[in-house]
């Protein structure tokens, strides 16, 4: 997600600092920042300190074979009677997620503060951050993220949080996006879409990214298999997609999509990326995939809910082909957390008048920037935003965990202030 700039037709692919629309990038930027994961190599070799492994041999494309490692339960949802109080766990929070004692303390504190929902990252940079047979069978990665004590961080988080009455909703952060250096992008160049000029990458604040073609069955199958794997292996309450479950409107000019459009419409793709019929056709294709994905997930677990964290509706549709107003109307999502990262209270509260936030069909919440690394959002601004949301009956989710209090110069003092704002139990 992005923040700090006013509403602008910014580069729609980015959830980074520069677009003013989305969330702090946690993929390539996290790698540059030196995040080190404990990696176990399936063949029994020693672990090594690098999040992205060297290229393995070419993959077969098998279906997933999820064998539940955790006893299945039927998790119960807390909402909608209780407004959302959520927080994302990103790759920048791996130091907490991988350390058992730190994670226990974090979850206890979040419980005391009244948090209802945790969103841990499971899909970032073309790699899975859960125990994934799907990516390993496809030779997209040959490592599994483990905690410092050898534990599965996601399973540990779920166990701790649900004991505190909190929901855990794994977050598929990258959606259809991937770095060009990822095994996914290198092994399947035919899965990538492109602009009218033939470019397959776009620049973001974190560097170059490619976009998987959301209209290709193979791409849809990969995301479906990953999501089904997570809800089968883990006792999660839901899954979350966000502004990267989309496609920048300048993309879709690859040969596969051109042929599909001509076959279905009898016309060539318009040169104008913002042509209304061309926008609608691509957006409807993404909607159709979400419809099928929801059906598959609900068949696996009827109690599961689908969360979405998009940009505001006009931006999402016109620039990202993400027609989430239709998704709400058609019951394809059960929770919406709109990204509104604004640098001051005045511009933030002005955004709360958007019509899509007034809907009563399902719980509506707003994502608030807690800060970046060692630059936490000033507590008076955080307090003003939380109060503005609560006055309107809207839930709140913080991006992300570390700058709430842990990664600050005075964690204890910051935690006390946060407790005063949220009403520590």
Which residues does each PLM region occupy?
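Glycine-rich, aromatic-flanked loop segments that form ligand/cofactor-binding clefts
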Residues: 115-122, 153-202, 240-243
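Aromatic- and acidic-residue-enriched segments that line the glycan-binding/catalytic groove
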Residues: 130-142, 176-203, 243-270
């Amino acid at each position: 997600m992005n923040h700090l700039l006013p509403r602008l037709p910014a580069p729609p692919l980015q959830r980074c600092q520069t677009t003013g629309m989305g969330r702090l990038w946690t993929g390539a930027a996290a790698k540059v920042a030196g995040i080190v994961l404990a990696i176990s190599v399936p063949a029994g070799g020693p672990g090594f300190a690098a999040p992205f492994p060297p290229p393995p041999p070419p993959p077969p494309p098998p279906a997933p074979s999820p064998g539940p490692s955790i006893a299945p339960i039927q998790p119960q949802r807390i909402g909608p009677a209780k407004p959302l109080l959520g927080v994302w766990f990103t790759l920048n929070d791996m130091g907490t997620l991988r350390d058992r004692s730190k994670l226990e303390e974090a979850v206890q504190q979040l419980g005391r503060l009244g948090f209802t929902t945790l969103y841990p990252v499971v899909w970032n940079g073309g790699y899975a951050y859960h125990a994934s047979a799907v990516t390993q069978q496809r030779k997209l990665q040959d490592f599994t993220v483990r905690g410092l004590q050898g534990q599965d961080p996601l399973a540990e988080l779920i166990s701790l949080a649900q004991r505190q009455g909190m929901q855990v909703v794994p977050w598929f952060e990258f959606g259809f996006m991937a770095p060009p250096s990822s095994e996914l992008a290198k092994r399947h160049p035919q899965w990538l879409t492109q602009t009218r000029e033939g470019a397959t990458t776009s620049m973001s604040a974190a560097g170059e990214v490619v976009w998987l073609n959301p209209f290709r069955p193979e791409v849809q199958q990969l995301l479906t298999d990953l999501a089904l794997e997570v809800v089968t292996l883990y006792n999660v309450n839901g899954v979350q997609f966000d502004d990267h479950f989309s496609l920048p409107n300048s993309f879709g000019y690859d040969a596969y999509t051109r042929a599909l459009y001509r076959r279905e419409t009898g016309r060539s793709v318009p040169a104008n990326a913002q042509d209304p019929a061309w926008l609608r056709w691509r957006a409807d294709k993404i909607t159709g995939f979400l419809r099928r994905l929801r059906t598959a997930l609900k068949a696996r677990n009827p109690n599961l809910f689908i969360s979405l964290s998009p940009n505001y509706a006009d931006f999402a549709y016109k620039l990202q082909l993400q027609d989430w107003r239709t998704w709400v109307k058609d019951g394809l999502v059960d929770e919406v957390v709109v990204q509104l990262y604004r640098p001051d209270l005045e511009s933030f509260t002005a955004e709360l008048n958007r019509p899509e936030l007034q809907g009563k069909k399902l719980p509506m919440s707003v994502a608030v920037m807690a800060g970046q690394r060692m630059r936490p959002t000033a507590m008076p601004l955080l307090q003003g935003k939380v109060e503005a949301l609560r006055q309107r009956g809207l839930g709140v989710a913080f991006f992300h965990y570390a700058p709430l209090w842990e990664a600050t110069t005075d964690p204890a003092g910051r935690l006390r202030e946060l407790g005063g704002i949220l009403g520590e139990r």
